[in-house]
Amino acid sequence: MSDASSTILFEYPLNEKTRTWLRIESLSQQLHQNHSLTDMGSALTFFRAIAELLDVLERGDVRTELLKELERQQQKLLQWSDVPGVDMERIHSLRRQLKDLSSTLMAAPRMGQFLREDRLIGMVRQRLGIPGGCCSFDLPTLHSWLHQPKELREQLVFSWLNSLSPLKQALDMILELIRHSGTFRPQTSLNGFFQDNASDADLLRLRLEQMHQLYPQISGHKTRYAIRFLPLDSENGHIPPRLTFELACC
């Protein structure tokens, strides 16, 4: 997020696996942004992100889906080998990275298991569902731990984040390749509505000028999608008859 940018980027997943991956990416970013745990607020944000990440990981076989996607991306890169003028050194480098990530992910323990077995995480996770349930009288262990020397806390936090490294590295690579597979092109909505074919895409990326004070409401799946633009101010906002925006189908 940046106030300096004149455009806003929106992303919408077109299948369940991409939806899960974007949620994991978002939670991973929250963990790394709040890992310093300088106060109770940042600590609760950090532990809440861990709890939500574990919930997401427990809903499906994330590792299997990532391994399938790493293999699929390798095959896609292999197809580029037949294109005249393609940078073969770059292709080989990316394929090696994908193979290494696949091997590391396959050898890693169960996703999130190290975090599930941690006593402090378990206690905090149990109390997060209770409104205000992480007060010092509810969780004296957390209150005491936050007053431990910074070096000791950082050492433990590093071990938590490091346990997620195989997951994060594989996911970062996959999402980067998916995002770069689509090119932004100018599109125009009529009376706030736009629809098109998705062509088995995984992800929609939409750039919109901030000055319009609009946001997109997107629905769709791997074959077709629809976008409706709505005003931030639902009472006094205006939707132009023709609105230009940029869209990438990835």
From Swiss-Prot:
Question: Does the entry feature the keyword Cytoplasm, yes or no?
Answer: yes
> Predominant location of this chain?
cytoplasm
Q: Which GO terms describe its cellular component?
A: cell division site; cytoplasm
What keywords would UniProt list here? Cell cycle, Cell division, Cytoplasm, Septation
Q: Where in the cell is it found?
A: Cytoplasm
Stretches that traverse the bilayer = none
UniProt-listed InterPro entries? ZapD, ZapD_C, ZapD_sf
Q: Which GO terms describe its biological process?
A: division septum assembly; FtsZ-dependent cytokinesis
Disulphides = none
Q: Indicate whether Cell cycle appears among the record's keywords.
A: yes
The UniProt entry's sequence similarity note says: Belongs to the ZapD family.
Show the HAMAP family listed in the entry: ZapD (MF_01092)
* Described purpose of this protein according to its UniProt entry: Cell division factor that enhances FtsZ-ring assembly. Directly interacts with FtsZ and promotes bundling of FtsZ protofilaments, with a reduction in FtsZ GTPase activity.
**Subunit organization:** Interacts with FtsZ.
This protein is called what?
Cell division protein ZapD
Lineage of the source organism? Bacteria, Pseudomonadati, Pseudomonadota, Gammaproteobacteria, Enterobacterales
Which gene produces this protein? zapD
